[in-house]
């Protein structure tokens, strides 16, 4: 049983099931010669056309699945994902996609939104609606958006009308978007404006909802992700003493919490938080 930040290799209670694809090769291992632009358009089509895994059948799929209860990886080598899925010998660490799926039971009624970022990509579909998509790239747009102009458009600063139009059409990061910066995550603050709050959604306690989470690394090098959950209208238990950003709980499906190295860059989180039990 191999356990990593990307999940455990044995089916375990209350987890989402992750499947790993390498778009650089066919199921039989032949190179696809996809360019980065072609990869981005595949990503965009997948996320905006119903998350249909049949669209990915032409690519190599790892035989190993992983079972994850939270989505939190401080900056690490992009090779860690193929390694976790047991295919590092076959897969170079770029242009890979991992999709986690399951159903979760709402632990309480209320309005929530995901908060986070992916380096390069993290997107979430909850109850068949795209509610989160932010990182170095936005999957729904199929574009790199870690730039001052995209951040300005998301913050609804004057101008940038063409970019604002694209964001409105995608319907996830409709300006103005809330950014949170944490004093322990300087690199993400400088490059991506921090982490972002996604689209609000309502749930009823006890109801069960489908959830899908997509993560991806595009050029290779480093990978990182954070997925937190904010209850809209609820005051946070604590705030970053330097930036004032709320310290939020992780989105998680069991009681386990990661133990990040506090000496390295990381997004802080509140270790106490509700658990969204996964229902088989």
Q: Model-found features: residue ranges?
A:
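Acidic/polar, compositionally biased interaction segments
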Residues: 1-280
């Amino acid at each position: 049983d191999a356990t990593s930040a990307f999940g455990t290799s044995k089916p375990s209670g209350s987890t989402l099931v992750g499947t790993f694809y390498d778009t650089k090769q066919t199921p039989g291992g032949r190179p696809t010669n996809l360019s980065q632009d072609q990869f981005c358009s595949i990503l965009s089509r997948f996320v905006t056309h119903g998350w249909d895994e049949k669209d990915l059948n032409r690519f190599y799929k790892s035989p190993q699945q992983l079972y994850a209860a939270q989505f939190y990886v401080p900056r690490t080598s992009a090779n860690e994902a193929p390694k976790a899925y047991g295919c590092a010998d076959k897969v170079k660490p770029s242009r890979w996609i991992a999709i986690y799926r399951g159903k979760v039971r709402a632990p309480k009624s209320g309005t929530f939104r995901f908060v986070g970022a992916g380096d390069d990509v993290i997107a979430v579909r909850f109850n068949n609606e795209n509610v989160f998509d932010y990182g170095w790239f936005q999957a729904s747009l199929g574009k790199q958006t870690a730039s001052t102009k995209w951040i300005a458009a998301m913050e609804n600063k004057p101008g940038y009308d063409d970019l604002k139009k694209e964001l409105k059409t995608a319907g996830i990061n409709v300006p103005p978007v809330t950014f949170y910066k944490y004093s322990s995550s300087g690199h993400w603050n400088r490059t991506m404006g921090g982490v972002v709050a996604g689209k609000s959604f309502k749930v009823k306690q006890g109801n069960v909802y489908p959830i899908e989470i997509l993560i991806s690394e595009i050029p290779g090098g480093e990978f990182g992700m954070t997925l937190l959950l904010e209850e809209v209208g609820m005051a946070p238990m604590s705030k970053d003493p330097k930036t004032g950003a709320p310290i939020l709980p992780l989105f998680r499906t069991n009681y386990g919490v990661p133990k990040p190295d506090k000496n390295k860059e990381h997004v802080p989180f509140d270790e106490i938080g509700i658990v969204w039990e996964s229902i088989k």
